[in-house]
Amino acid sequence: MIKRMYWVAAAAVACVLSADAAFDARPVSIAYRTRKEGSVDVAGIRFNLPRGHNDSVTGLDVGFIGLCTYMYGVQANVLGSLVKDRAGALQVSLYNDVDGLLTGVQVAGWNNARGGEGLQIGLLNLSDEFYGVQVGLINRANLLRGFQIGVINVIRGARVPFVPVVNVGF
């Protein structure tokens, strides 16, 4: 009977360890060195000390520089918040970059999103295709469906590409 209990306990530990490996996600990650793409996903909190790189982060991402392929949640880093593919997030940093599609809000000195919808607030806001509002000193979009509020507002695909103060794209 005792031998059987040891086997059951060993099997339970093996199941927990293999389940952890199968899901490959951590509730808390302290990223103290650069990780390569294809690394552990984080579902919870990631601390970037100084830089973290994970495929997917769901939850809170804080530190100095945060880099991931997919971000869902809040990304608040001192120097940079960088997403390679898709972000459904609030990004707050000196520099925010979403190389794919942003759905959410970017607040920074410099915001960059290849495409997306939501709100960009910063000194410099750049986007290729954006649906929403850009508020900043300089706002530029190739295609914009929404508003730009700032000193220099440029919508490259518009009939009148430059309008100061308020620019509207339809």
Where are these predicted regions, by residue range?
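Hydrophobic h-region of N-terminal signal peptides that target proteins for export
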Residues: 11-19
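Bacterial N-terminal signal peptides that target proteins for export
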Residues: 1-8
